[in-house]
Amino acid sequence: MRRNGALLLMAVLAACGETPPPCSSPDNAGSAPSAGCLVWDARGALLVKDWSGEWALPGGSVNASESPRCGAEREVFEETGLIARAGDLAIVFDNGFHLYWCGVPASAEPRIHRPLEVADVTWWNLEALPDGTWRYPGQGAMIRELILARLEAPAD
């Protein structure tokens, strides 16, 4: 039992100490208190669940030395282990949270990268997005609306 506890502690500490990759576009343009990514591809929307049981998009606080775009990419890595590339700005919320459309490699699979913060990380298809268990009220409906609008938009 003691050996299993020591192995778990080593795994937690190793994941927390991993350095995020460099930002894909370190432009340092703009500022925001927080940012995140809406990663949507053939697998669905990438969501994280915290230990209270609530789902959310990967995201969090932006460091003083980084742009919102870089903060969004870093947060995806910290929470899911995936290397994301932030693209277009999807929306800025009233609280200043910047949400970007982000891509990850098609072969990459998410993993719980911060086990003290994240209880689960997975892909959800549009029809199966969980109802009523969101960190922020109305977030599930907002994600559906953003994805549907993007799918219906004419290609450039």
Question: What are these regions, as identified by a protein language model?
Answer:
Residues D50:
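Short loop/turn segments immediately following the C-termini of beta-strands
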Residues G5-A14:
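Bacterial N-terminal signal peptides
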Residues G44-A45:
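Entry beta-strands of beta-propeller and related beta-repeat scaffolds
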Residues G17-A35:
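Acidic, metal-coordinating catalytic segment for phosphate/diphosphate chemistry
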Residues S61-M142, L146-A153:
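Unchanged
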Residues A56-G60:
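A short gly/proline-enriched turn/hairpin at secondary-structure junctions
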